[in-house]
Amino acid sequence: MNTQFKLIGFDLDGTLVNSLPDLALSVNSALAEFNLPQAPEELVLTWIGNGAPVLIARALDWAKKQTGKVLTETEVKQVTERFNFYYGENLCNVSRLYPNVKETLEILKEKGYVLAVVTNKPTRHVQPVLAAFGIDHLFSEMLGGQSLPAIKPHPAPLYYLCGKFGFEPRQVLFVGDSKNDIIAGHAAGCAVVGLTYGYNYNIPIRESNPDWVFDDFAQLLSIL
């Protein structure tokens, strides 16, 4: 066990789980109800990372450019609600854990690290997704988009973890795939691992200057 780090926080989408197919399906199902065009999966990928309201706002902005159709504030709320409904029904139809995630988490837990999830995903979806892959029991805390007043890139979730478990920021390692993860971690005073395979708006994660850059989740074991 690395004696510097006591707690390891993980982003969810694009870090632990490849959830893009189910997210894209849910976005397009919601858009279809309002006669809006279907977005290709590779485009939806660039909208992920700031929570459901921002995801839908980006989708509607794209749809507006395609069709010229402007939705009312009420309709925007309805699209978001329909997305949440469809995603709730399709959390793990096609989503999969990335390679080596479960095995690595089990090793880290066995080594004595406190493990936590910090995601901007709607809070009500976090535990069900983790449970579907049989890894929810490995985490001592699961923070979603509605768990606290602020979400990433604000450092509040990491401050919360430090306070709850009694650790200094230097004792916390955060692992994510997007610039929001890197910004949040560094703002909190934590070291950060950037993973290259996730959803960083098609921008190389290295450009966000994480402390380590890994291509495979199992590479975490090289520093822990």
Swiss-Prot record:
The record's listing under Gene3D superfamilies reads: HAD superfamily/HAD-like (3.40.50.1000), Putative phosphatase, domain 2 (1.10.150.240)
Q: Which residues of the sequence carry a binding annotation for Mg(2+)? A: 11, 13, 177
SUPFAM superfamilies xrefs: HAD-like
Q: What are the positions of the active site?
A: 11 (nucleophile)
**Catalytic activity as recorded in UniProt:** 2-phosphoglycolate + H2O = glycolate + phosphate
What Pfam families has UniProt attached to this entry? HAD_2
Q: Return the EC number.
A: 3.1.3.18
Q: Which residues form a coiled coil?
A: none
Give the molecular function GO annotations. metal ion binding; phosphoglycolate phosphatase activity
Record-stated family:
Belongs to the HAD-like hydrolase superfamily. CbbY/CbbZ/Gph/YieH family.
Its job: Specifically catalyzes the dephosphorylation of 2-phosphoglycolate. Is involved in the dissimilation of the intracellular 2-phosphoglycolate formed during the DNA repair of 3'-phosphoglycolate ends, a major class of DNA lesions induced by oxidative stress.
NCBIfam families in the record: HAD-SF-IA-v1, HAD-SF-IA-v3, PGP_bact, PRK13222.1-2
Q: What is this protein called?
A: Phosphoglycolate phosphatase
Please name the source species. Haemophilus influenzae (strain ATCC 51907 / DSM 11121 / KW20 / Rd)
